[in-house]
Amino acid sequence: MTTHTKNHPCRAKARPYIHPAIRYNKRRMAESFRSRMMRWAFNFFPAFRGTGGRVTYIAEDWSEVRIRLPLNWRTRNYVGTIYGGSMYGAVDPFYMVMLIRRLGPEYIVWDKSATVRFQKPGRGTLTARFTVGDEELRAIAQALETGARSVDRTYQVELKDETGVVCATVEKVVYIRRKEAPEKSLRDE
């Protein structure tokens, strides 16, 4: 008796693979050599590697970053789902780093706070997509030009499973301000 692998009972739970560019229904900007090197650096950096997360894509202009967080022996908790600390740790650094890269060296950017809402246990590989558009950069510059010393911006990212169901939502508050010009000393005059 021959069984086909398509009808095999172990294959019944397999979900079809959907390419990330199709899943998010957006055209993907090509990675540059520099952004690819940063992706590799993130993936090999011990603090990020310890979360179990993997950066899968960084746009050349840092307007988009994508990550995945698989369920494996490093991310599995006592009840067999993805550990909540791994979920948060995998998404923690990206909005701050993206804003630092997009705004440039004349700005100071810090994470100020974070809130995590767990909606469903992560029972498989989770993905997250971070975006910081040009309109967001204009809004930040405009807020700082109106006389405000600093501005707090709130960003939200969702960790989704393979079927697109949201397992956790992370809300990050990021502090941004312009660097002040160094004061001239009397010797400089």
Model-derived segments and spans:
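Short hydrophobic alpha-helical segments enriched in small aliphatic residues
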Residues: T5, P9, I18-P20
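Short structured motifs
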Residues: G50-V55, K112-F118, I140-Q142
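Short, low-complexity intrinsically disordered segments enriched in A/P/G/S/L with frequent Arg
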Residues: M1-T3, A12-R15
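HotDog/MaoC-like acyl-thioester-processing domains
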Residues: A21-R28, S32, G122-R123, G133-E189
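Alpha-helical membrane-targeting segments
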Residues: H19-G50, R74, Y78
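Catalytic strand-loop segment that frames the active site of acyl-thioester-processing enzymes
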Residues: G50-T81
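Hot-dog-fold acyl-thioester-processing enzymes
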Residues: T75-F94
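Hydrophobic beta-strand-centered segment that forms part of the acyl-chain substrate-binding groove
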Residues: M98-E135
